[in-house]
């Protein structure tokens, strides 16, 4: 049985990966009178007087919504809300298993920006946070920014920021392995969608200043055509040298490659043209931009991918459960840039210097320390 066949079989057996489990048990008339009418009126009256009391008396304190419109699901593309459900259920499982956070999958049958924003605002009272998932760019940028302005609970687009945080964590440790310095490193980010933009922003915030973004058309610059509004903002702060040309041109003399793009688009010749001891994070799934063995043969020192069957998996599951755990426990109203930086540094710190090597720059999601270390990093900044 192939993995694909096994996955389909298990999903059929599970018939959904989630269920509701009651914390209050109704076995007697007294139980019923306390959990429901008439007793339930008491917390209702308290909350009506003080909305903050909902965190004390309801599931709001440890429950988030995982919201998607199904427009950019994994490598499957715009498959719609129903087909996106297995992914959102899976995401909810990861929140619970790794962070102890309750998560409810909500797949919306609209891809209209205004309708999505209005719907999330209207359902927000039931939740302590909103995790946006698999919403296509550039709509995802506006949806997140508007919701952050409108709501007093944390809103987090994991495809952007979870990915960026783990990439930065990996790069922090890869710099130690290679002896490179962020101030002088030349970085190429290939893929100018949600993840690529967020990665670039966080690397800039951390202190990288020589970053070039590329997409299918090549190097992005101020004179590039057909840029969306977010990409136009990004070319104002990247490619300061005014480079033009292809991905190969961008990689010539670069120190770090971060790929969130397409399979097999980086060649050995491109890697060989990079600076000595290059760092490559080739995260296209399931087939990376270049296979690790080929990158190593061409001279790369540290190679990470999105896959669990290669060393240095760059997996945002080490970030998002702990981020929301900390945000909920600390009653954060926003997840700030400072929190993202602190989270990346915390994840990087899980691999001590004496254990760092070219094949060990990131801790695994199954490391029991991860969620607590990440959540503490978030709470310290609330």
Locate predicted features.
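Glycine-rich phosphate/diphosphate-binding loop of Rossmann-like nucleotide-binding domains
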Residues: 74, 81-99, 157, 165-262
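Solvent-exposed alpha-helices and their adjacent loops that cap or buttress functional pockets
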Residues: 12, 55-60, 96-97, 122-124, ...
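Adenosine-phosphate binding glycine-rich loop
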Residues: 158, 282-382
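N-terminal ligand-binding/catalytic initiation module
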Residues: 1-153, 375, 381
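Short, ordered loop/turn segments at secondary-structure junctions
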Residues: 69-71, 79, 108-109, 134-137, ...
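Rossmann-like adenosine-cofactor binding region
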Residues: 232-302, 307-309
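General beta-strand structural signal in soluble alpha/beta enzymes
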Residues: 105, 131-134, 155-158, 189, ...
């Amino acid at each position: 049985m192939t993995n694909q066949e096994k996955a389909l079989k298990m999903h059929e057996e599970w018939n959904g990966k989630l269920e509701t489990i009651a914390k209050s048990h109704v076995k007697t008339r007294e139980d019923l009178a306390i959990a429901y009418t008439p007793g339930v009126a008491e917390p209702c009256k308290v909350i009506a007087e003080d909305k903050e009391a909902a965190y004390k008396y309801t599931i709001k304190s440890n429950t988030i919504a995982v919201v998607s419109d199904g427009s950019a699901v994994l490598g499957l593309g715009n498959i719609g809300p129903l087909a996106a459900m297995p992914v959102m259920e899976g995401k909810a499982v990861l929140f619970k298993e790794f962070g102890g956070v309750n998560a409810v999958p909500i797949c919306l049958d609209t891809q209209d920006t205004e309708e999505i924003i209005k719907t999330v605002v209207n359902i927000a009272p039931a939740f302590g946070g909103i995790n946006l998932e698999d919403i296509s760019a550039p709509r995802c940028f506006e949806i997140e920014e508007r919701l952050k302005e409108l709501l007093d609970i944390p809103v987090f687009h994991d495809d952007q920021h979870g990915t960026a945080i783990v990439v930065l964590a990996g790069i922090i440790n890869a710099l130690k392995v290679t002896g490179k310095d962020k101030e002088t490193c030349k970085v190429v980010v290939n893929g100018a969608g949600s993840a690529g933009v967020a990665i670039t922003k966080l690397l800039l915030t951390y202190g990288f200043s020589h970053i070039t973004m590329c997409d299918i058309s090549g190097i992005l610059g101020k004179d590039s055509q057909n840029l969306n509004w977010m990409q136009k903002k990004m070319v104002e702060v990247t490619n300061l040298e005014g480079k033009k040309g292809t991905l190969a041109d961008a990689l010539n003399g670069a120190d770090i490659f971060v790929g969130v793009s397409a399979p097999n688009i980086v060649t050995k010749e491109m890697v060989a043209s990079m600076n000595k001891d290059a760092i490559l994070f080739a995260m296209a799934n399931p087939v990376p931009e270049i296979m690790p063995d080929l990158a190593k043969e061409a001279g790369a020192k540290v190679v990470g991918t999105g896959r669990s069957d290669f060393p240095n998996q760059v997996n945002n599951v080490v970030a998002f459960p702990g981020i929301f755990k900390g945000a909920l426990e600390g009653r954060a109203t926003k997840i700030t840039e400072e929190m993202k930086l602190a989270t990346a540094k915390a994840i990087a710190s899980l691999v001590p210097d004496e254990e760092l090597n070219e094949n060990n720059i990131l801790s695994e999601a199954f490391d029991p320390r991860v969620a607590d270390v990440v959540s503490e990093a978030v709470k310290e900044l609330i």
